[in-house]
From Swiss-Prot:
The gene is rfcL. One of its GO terms (biological process) is DNA replication. This is Replication factor C large subunit. It comes from Methanobrevibacter smithii (strain ATCC 35061 / DSM 861 / OCM 144 / PS). Belongs to the activator 1 small subunits family. RfcL subfamily. The lineage of its organism: Archaea, Methanobacteriati, Methanobacteriota, Methanomada group, Methanobacteria. Residues 429-450, 462-492 are annotated as: Disordered. Part of the RFC clamp loader complex which loads the PCNA sliding clamp onto DNA. Disulfide bonds: none annotated. Keywords: ATP-binding, DNA replication, Nucleotide-binding. Gene3D superfamilies: 1.10.8.60, P-loop containing nucleotide triphosphate hydrolases.
């Protein structure tokens, strides 16, 4: 079990550091519990200082909580269908509030997360439950629109004495022999990152019987990993490979870092051959990122990072002394969106190719006709249903959504057709089974049965007088028999 999980604080008081912010958060919680709705909290600060832990500790004071983090797909539709519905619906436990946690909102990027920040802003306006948003970079443009809608709390790094105190307690609990100087140095090198300090301590404790100062001095730290700007600046301004590699240890999506570097190359480099060589390395980095995505082998990231970092850095003949303002991606963002459009086109063509048994090029040539056909709501639904189009694929051919009434109508028709097809198939099976039954032989009637029937018919033809005559004879015979019996008795 990881020590970060084992020693994770369970309450707000157990969270180390940021005492002033904790007091404000407790007041925020108390107001919600008293029935006074508050603006969402936006916790901003470096990784590893306990923002998520703090939010989860707060969650224990509410009836339930829902969390959406960086590992989840966070597109506009996903956020609205999960957090959006929960933000306005009642808790499972009655009238109590439920806490909604959105982690790493500044990390929402790429095709899968497009529209996510806008969806969060819409949810905040309608939310009836407390919300906590978490971000790493206070200056990220992605959260600029969210700052005005939230109460922003800037979380500070945990002080090294506080980290050292916790490491000592863990050493006692786990029975680890550690030199106090080693723990003090580890706390200092963690640069305020409590999680990093605990993970490093556990890794070293598993390798050494006694933790010494020399063990700590040999480890690398994560200093200067605060912003993406530092990493991009190092790539463009430095020619020292070690410095560049260390500077690129940023808590950001590496493809985004690559786009930042690519955007700012012509702002820093002035020679054509330098710019050409730098972009060749960017192309190679992008190639390895693509291989990593397609193969799901993320070991390719190392090669991609080397090309976009050391490769671009080495492309210049000398360092430039001028000041260069690092800007966020614009051209490469558009290129990325175009790449997304190409991927969408290829997905659609692949589905058409499989269903219609045509080539990709023929499928793509049909797109203009599909745009015309998709103007009809019912036809758009039928084509989408047949080809298995998803929502973003439908949007390729029409900007408007298919009306809900049309969808419900077409789904009912489809369900009715399925029932009819099932009944027809069932009838075919029944007819097939009946056809396998062998023909039955005719059963001949017994002669005795015919005779009995004739006798019955003769009886039916007898007249009433004949029946009366027979009954009269029976009456006359009975007394005679009785007299005979009496004579014989007297003779005896």
């Amino acid at each position: 079990m990881l020590w970060t999980d084992k020693y994770r604080p369970k309450t707000l008081d157990e969270v180390v550091g940021n005492n002033k912010e904790k007091a404000l958060i407790q007041k925020w919680v108390d107001n919600w519990k008293a029935g006074n709705p508050q603006k969402p909290l936006l916790l901003v600060g470096p990784p590893g200082i306990g923002k998520t832990t703090l939010a989860q500790a707060i969650a224990r004071e509410f009836s339930e909580y829902i969390e959406l983090n960086a590992s989840d797909k966070r597109s506009q539709d996903v956020i609205k269908s999960t957090i959006g519905e929960s933000s306005s619906s009642k808790s499972l436990f009655g009238d109590d509030y439920k806490l909604l946690i959105l982690d790493e909102v500044d990390g929402i990027h790429g095709t899968n997360d497009r529209g996510g920040v806008r969806a969060i802003g819409d949810i905040i306006k309608k939310a009836k439950h407390p919300m906590i948003l978490i971000a790493n970079d206070f200056y990220s443009k992605r959260i600029a629109s969210l700052k005005t809608k939230c109460d922003v709390l800037k979380m500070s790094k945990v002080r090294s004495p506080s980290i050292n105190k916790l490491l000592k307690q863990i050493a006692i609990n786990e029975g680890i022999k550690a030199n106090p100087a080693a723990l003090k140095e580890l706390a200092k090198k963690s640069n305020g990152d409590m999680r990093s300090a605990i993970n490093t301590f556990q890794a070293l404790a598993n390798q050494n019987e006694v933790l010494e100062l020399s063990d700590i001095e040999n480890i690398t730290t994560k200093d200067d990993r605060s912003t993406i700007i530092n990493g991009v600046t190092a790539v463009l301004k430095s020619k020292n490979p070690n410095h560049v590699k260390k500077a690129l240890m940023v808590e950001e999506d590496p493809t985004l870092v690559m786009e930042y570097i690519a955007e700012n190359i012509p702002r820093e480099y002035t020679k054509k051959k330098e710019i050409k060589k730098a972009y060749e390395n960017i192309a190679k980095a992008d190639l390895y990122f693509g291989r990593a995505r397609s193969s799901r082998y993320y070991g390719y990231w190392k090669y991609a990072t080397d090309f976009m970092g050391v490769g671009v850095s080495d492309a210049k003949d000398e360092t430039y002394k001028k000041f260069t303002r690092i800007t966020s991606p614009t051209v490469f963002t558009l290129m990325g969106r175009n790449r997304g459009k190409r991927n969408l086109r290829d997905r659609i063509a692949e589905k058409m190719s499989q269903k219609l048994h045509i080539s990709h090029s023929v499928a793509i040539s049909m797109f203009p006709y599909l745009e015309i056909m998709f103007e009809n709501n019912e036809l758009a639904w039928e084509i989408s249903d047949f080809l298995g189009f998803e929502e973003d694929e439908i949007k390729r051919f029409r900007t408007r959504k298919i009306p809900k009434k049309v969808i419900e109508k077409m789904e009912k028709q489809k369900a009715q057709k399925r029932v009819e097809q099932r009944d027809a198939r069932a009838q075919e099976i029944q007819d097939g089974l009946m056809a396998t039954i062998p023909p039955q032989k005719e059963v001949k009637e017994e002669p005795t049965e015919e005779i009995q029937e004739e006798v019955v018919d003769e009886i039916k033809e007898e007249t009433v007088e004949e029946i009366q005559e027979e009954s009269q004879k029976e009456v006359e015979e009975k007394p005679k028999k009785k007299t005979d019996k009496q004579v014989s008795l007297f003779n005896f």
